[in-house]
A protein has these predicted regions:
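Rossmann-fold NAD(P)-binding glycine/threonine-rich loop
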Residues: 90-136
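Residues that mark the start of a beta-strand
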Residues: 1-2, 85, 142
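Active-site-lining helix/loop region of Rossmann-like oxidoreductase modules
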Residues: 140-199
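Rossmann-like NAD(P)-binding element
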Residues: 45-85, 89-95
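General beta-strand structural signal in soluble alpha/beta enzymes
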Residues: 50, 117-123, 168-172
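NAD(P)+-binding Rossmann beta1-loop-alpha1 motif at the extreme N-terminus of oxidoreductases
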Residues: 1-39, 43
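Structural/interface elements that position substrates and couple domains in central-metabolism enzymes
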Residues: 27, 97-100, 166
């Protein structure tokens, strides 16, 4: 299984640190040349591999960690995303709900990435929290997942556990996606909730 993070701002780097912490190799890409962020990637760890966008999207599981607006530009990198899992880490800050047809922002992302199996997740934590070791006082930091594809959600749940988190599935995008979205000025009830689960 191969992994990529598209977007290397605060959230993208926080995700990369989670992969590095657990010795899992991941490609990172932006719309810029990989040389422009190679030193930042190297500072996180040797398993963080800078790539061109066209190469990074060959991965099996892709974390979309860009601002909401450019997600449609990233979606144009491939004619079809069939067979790939997209983890939507975006938040539609300031995007009026009417621009999204009243639907969850994750539904709009799913429509842009034709054929992909989309899982909404890892977006409800701010970067400063997401980048921390998720092992907290004997428990594990919670990440919420929502998807219309149960098998994809299960796969990302396993990955989340391998990264040290405790995944909680919220159901489909229309229900669970609404709970963890920041869309326009209406925020879901679970957005930015930093919770720890004790087994």
């Amino acid at each position: 299984m191969s992994y990529a993070i598209i977007g290397f701002g605060n959230i993208g780097q926080a995700l990369a640190k989670a992969f590095a912490r657990n010795g899992i190799e991941v490609s990172v890409a932006t719309t810029r040349a990989p040389e422009s962020f190679a030193s930042a990637a190297a500072a996180i760890g040797p398993g963080i591999i800078p790539k061109k966008l066209a190469d990074a999207v060959k991965a099996d599981i892709i974390f979309l960690a860009v601002r909401f607006g450019p997600h449609s530009d990233v979606a144009k990198a491939l004619p079809t995303w069939r067979g790939k899992i997209i983890v939507d880490v975006t938040n539609a800050y300031g995007v009026p709900p009417e621009e999204l047809g009243g639907q969850p922002s994750s539904k709009a992302v799913a429509q842009a990435f034709t054929g992909a199996r989309l899982v909404k997740g890892f977006n409800h934590l701010v970067a400063a929290v997401l980048e921390q070791d998720p092992a907290v006082h004997g428990g594990r930091r919670v990440v919420f997942l929502a998807s219309d594809d149960d098998a994809a959600a299960a796969e990302i749940g396993t990955l989340a556990e391998n990264l040290g988190f405790s995944p909680i599935k919220l159901g489909g995008l229309s229900e669970g996606g609404l709970l963890v979205q920041a869309r326009g000025n209406s925020w879901g009830r679970l957005i930015f909730k930093d919770l720890v689960k004790f087994d």
